[in-house]
Amino acid sequence: MRRAAPAVDNRPREVNLMRKLRFFAAAAVALSLCVSTPSFAQARKDFKVCWTIYAGWMPWGYAKTQGIMSKWAKKYGINVDVVQLNDYIESINQYTAGKFDGCAMTNMDALTIPASGGVDSTALIVSDYSNGNDGVLVKGSGKKVADLKGQPVNLVELSVSHYLLARALESVGMSERDIKTVNTSDADISGAFATPAVHNAVTWNPMLADLKAKPNVTEVFDSSRIPGEIMDMMVVNTRTLHDNPALGKALTGAWFEIMQLMHGTSPDSQAALTSMAKASGTDLAGYKSQLSTTALFYTPQQALDFATSPNMPKIMTRVAQFSFDHGLLGKGAPNAGAVGMAFDNNVTVGNKNNLKLRFDPTYVRLAAQGKL
């Protein structure tokens, strides 16, 4: 599942412990790479990327099963294995530990796990942003965000659900001091909200769609109110990408071939969507409903325009501040700019001597120019 923090049974200290362990493990990996990598890296032939089930990432599975990924990899003389994992955070952990060359993840998680752990990472493709896929729910009719004041709110702490809640509170002049968060895993959120004791929750689709369809429930805020702030991306190890540009070309080419197919109206397009729906555990109507709140960039130009927007550094600065305020950039982080980020046109945010997250549109630009 997308954007799920570890299940910790309402014990936030364990969340922090897990993130600290990930931080030190990633730092160790980064250090080992620094001391053992030769000056002249030899081009590789075999690569692995991973993904987990989420509406906007189903194309990666389709790329594998239909041979589209293999076709593009063969074009550039390499092999790319696209591996589905069952646990979202575990997929990022494995990428951070060097077991995968790339991984599908959100912008906030890219910053707070691999990048803050010292693994230089590149957002190869910003594939979509949440446009209603994440929401804040309150039991009762006609409720508003202000009704959360003094109330417990169930959510996956330190995830983008937490970020969404903070933005919702901010929109009405409130802050997290006005509520109490109750850490609840994504697997438990639906069951918890069904009990009389739980009145408020923040979650994402498909759980969100199921819960807000229940009687006497109000969605008081959703991610369409903060367009572009919750991004879904394919993140690749920067050193690996630098040494093996064929990987970037193959992944990008395969992705946008599928985007073109999904956006069409032909029988082949419907068959592709039906296949993705089945793989995600729903039917075609259900999958299309999830896609309706996912702002997918169906063309390379759309993705390029978003990735090169002057708003990108502003959005990530806000995300970094939230991450720092919640201790997600590591214990020794002095400020929200501890982890440097690079954007198009040589724009940087944060520590320029510690650039660990890069929004590099090079390969999407090649796709937009028809050069892949």
Task: Please give the residue ranges for each predicted region.
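Conserved C-terminal helix/tail region of periplasmic/extracytoplasmic solute-binding proteins
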Residues: V319-L372
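Pocket-lining segment of extracytoplasmic ligand-binding domains
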Residues: D188-L284
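Sec/Tat signal peptide C-region and signal peptidase I cleavage site
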Residues: V35-A41
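Bacterial N-terminal signal peptides
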Residues: A26-V35
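Bacterial N-terminal signal peptides that target proteins for export
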Residues: N16-A25
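Secondary-structure end/capping motifs
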Residues: H242-A333
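Short, glycine-/small- and polar/acidic-enriched structural segments
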Residues: Q42-N183, S190, H199-N205, G228, ...
